[in-house]
A protein has these predicted regions:
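Cell-envelope and extracellular/periplasmic
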Residues: 1-505
């Protein structure tokens, strides 16, 4: 069967290509065919061009770096055949990945409906990678239909809200086209976005593979499909009961809901087609846009891994290192969102979200260039999907402005270290902090025995905090905001919250 000459959907009309880097453009063509491509301006000026030979049914063009531009045309020739994409922009391109809080669409976010109806931003574009966990005919058809959209009235309802607010602020700040490649799935572990090579590179990843297999992950595909269908019948019925309860009883709490209809039947069955399997979605989603030329990666994930925090930083680091390999950029910036405050009504605070935040911070230190957007003053009680997505999106943009563009942008103060003076433990900070009258102190100190007690006296002195507790005569350890849910009171002079920290050595 002859191989059709065509461009990958990522390079269709309206695409955004990355500026100031070699741009990789690919598609399919018969082996041995010579492929020539170029990007031209509206008046015919050639911005970049390249040539390659198709192998194994694919071609990969390497186009020399370009400066930013709009209203361009991408033309690719194969013999007498031509593929032409119009309305091409050259600017900044970010992959937006993670789970449900990155997935939450603009139409469901605060301000979303008004923005969808009225906002026209010719500089912001997005491309939704089809959400497919199995590569089959449906996935092939969905990929063929995928396309770029520009933010304009009536559109962008299905764009990641976090990515939207990130892109809007970035476009306004640097006056450049911004392309967002949306690639996420709610309820996923970091291991879903790691391929086999990344998982097997660490003992922690290998344990996930073994555990999933032991749970039945290698069962026959047809068996998994039957179990999956039965699960969604049950899940949809449960959701319908919950929706009716909320309609009949506005303000009903989750404990009351669970008592009436029973606990949520989540999780779906394991199996070879599950989107929640280790090493799955990276193959059926992320790698469909590899090896695109990117400016950076945006990531908001971790909620699903709070029960397994002890190895999260190792896994996250391995994931990013592998993504940098796949996208052929060892210094690709990784811009992460730290989890906000959250707890379900009636739940005991087990500090698992606090531990996950600290793991995210450890990974951020190891993954330079990169940064972490601090959301310690954000989150909603009993709602794991807060609808304020402007704050995380714009704080993530501030991280990009500092890390990627070398600009001066607001940053949360951070703890740099600690030392002791008698019965006082002193924490050194990257910037001075102020204590607000509202909120909790959330500072604890401990001696060598590791028994933590609330700080009773805090003195803020420039870039130092002096902490004391009558219960700890010889302080050696300190931690801040070691809770799933709380209202913080320590902020920088720029209004951003002090980042959570723990010094236990």
């Amino acid at each position: 069967m002859a191989i059709e000459f065509k461009l990958a959907p990522l390079f269709c009309n309206g695409a955004v290509l990355c500026r100031r880097k070699e741009v990789r453009v690919w598609g399919t063509a018969a082996d041995g065919q010579t492929i020539a491509g170029r990007v031209t301006t509206a008046d015919g000026l050639i911005l970049s061009e390249g040539i390659c030979t198709a192998r194994d049914g694919r071609f990969l063009l390497h186009l020399p770096p370009m400066e930013q531009a709009t209203s361009c045309t991408l033309t690719v020739h194969c013999g007498a055949e031509t593929c032409t994409s119009t309305d091409i922009s050259v600017g900044e391109v970010y992959l937006a990945s993670g789970q449900s809080n990155m997935e939450l669409e603009l139409q469901n976010a605060d301000e979303g409906q008004d923005l969808i109806a009225a906002h026209d931003d010719p500089l912001v574009h997005y491309f939704n990678v089809p959400k497919k966990s199995v590569w089959d005919d449906d996935a092939i058809a969905a990929e063929a239909a995928s396309h770029w959209e520009r933010v304009r009235p009536g559109y962008a309802r299905d764009m990641s809200a976090v990515a939207y607010f990130f892109a809007r602020k970035l476009a306004r700040t640097i006056d450049c086209p911004i392309g967002i490649i949306d690639c996420y799935w709610g309820g996923t572990s970091v291991t879903c976005w790691m391929d086999k090579e990344a998982l097997e590179a660490t003992a922690e990843g290998q344990r996930y593979i073994t555990r999933y297999r032991e749970q039945g992950g290698d069962k026959p595909f047809d068996q998994w499909r039957q179990e999956e269908d039965a699960f969604w019948v049950e899940m949809n019925a449960w959701n319908a009961h919950v929706a009716q309860l909320k309609k009949d009883n506005p303000g009903i709490s989750w404990p009351e809901i669970n008592e009436t209809v029973g606990p949520c039947p989540w999780h779906p069955p394991v199996g070879p087609g599950s989107p929640y399997r280790p090493g799955g979605l990276i193959e059926t989603m992320t790698k469909r846009v590899v090896p695109a030329t990117l400016t950076g990666i945006l990531y908001y994930q971790g909620e699903d891994d709070t029960a397994k925090t002890e190895h999260y930083d190792v896994l996250l680091t391995a994931m990013v290192m592998r993504l940098r390999q796949l996208f052929r950029d060892d210094s690709l910036p990784f811009l992460n969102v730290q989890l906000p405050m959250w707890i379900a009504a009636g739940d005991e605070d087990k500090h698992d979200w606090a531990r996950l935040r600290l793991a995210q911070a450890r990974a951020a230190s190891a993954l330079q260039p990169g940064g972490l957007a601090i959301l310690l003053d954000c989150g909603e009680f009993d709602n794991i999907h807060p609808t304020d997505k402007r704050t995380p999106g714009e704080r993530l943009c501030d991280v990009a402005l500092r890390v990627v563009y070398g600009m001066d942008a607001p940053e949360s103060p951070r703890a740099l270290g600690k030392y002791t003076q008698g019965d006082t433990l002193v924490v050194t900070l990257s910037a001075p902090v102020l204590r607000r009258e509202t909120g909790e102190l959330l500072l604890e100190i401990a001696g060598e025995d590791g028994a933590y007690h609330p700080v009773q006296s805090v003195t803020l002195d420039g870039t130092e905090m002096r902490l004391r507790s009558v219960a700890v005569l010889h302080p050696a350890k300190v931690r801040y905001a070691y809770v799933n849910w709380g209202k913080v009171s320590l902020f920088g002079r720029n209004g951003l919250p002090l980042a959570p920290f723990a010094f236990e050595g």
